[in-house]
Amino acid sequence: VRQCAFRVLVYHNRFAVEFFHALTDGTGALIFVKTLLAEYLSQKYGLTVPAVDGVLGRLEEPSDEELEDSFLRYAGDVKASRKESTAWHLSGTPEKDGFKNLVTLMVPAPELKACAKRYGVSVTELLCAAMMQAIAQLQAEKVPQRRLRKPVKVLLPVNLRNLFPSKTLRNFASYITPEVDPRMGDYTFDEICAAVHHRMGLENN
């Protein structure tokens, strides 16, 4: 972290940026990516991309709002325990030299939204439920004895800018952890969707 808190990866006509989460969150990272792409298009092709819709002006001084630590500004005095039950952890076979595989799935957005609507959940909740179902099925294969299984959880980031009037580009996200306990029995996909949806509604306010 002290050497470099983020890095830009380029491969053919694709690039990605990896951030240490203390630096920023998904919102700040997306703004950086848009601004970086705008600058690339400017230098490579001479295109002028206006500094709007999440694109910052490279030569402009950052505002105090962009640099603000919104956690310090909006944090209250209420303290809550962060202790949770232990979740089941995925395991795999490490690749040689720390190599990591990237699996990409492309889904038409209209179809994804329509599917989420059928289950009465948001797209985020639908994808979370799908991951939880896959993890539960994998755990059932690896841990045949139900009583030895552990809760299935997915950590979902929540953009706190939707709850507080903040324009910070620093990390301003919280997390919600929907879960199902396979020791209580098998869950249908509808039941998992409902569990995720109600957990999100309970905590995301």
Descriptions of predicted regions:
Residues 17-34, 102-147:
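Acyl activation and transfer enzymes in specialized metabolism, enriched
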Residues 29-30, 37-38, 43-45, 52, ...:
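Alpha-helix boundary/interfacial micro-motifs
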Residues 1-16, 30:
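Well-ordered mid-protein domain cores that form the structural environment of catalytic cofactors
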Residues 13-15, 99-101, 174-176:
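Short amphipathic alpha-helical segments
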Residues 1-6, 104, 113, 137-205:
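Acyl-thioester-dependent acyl-group transfer interface
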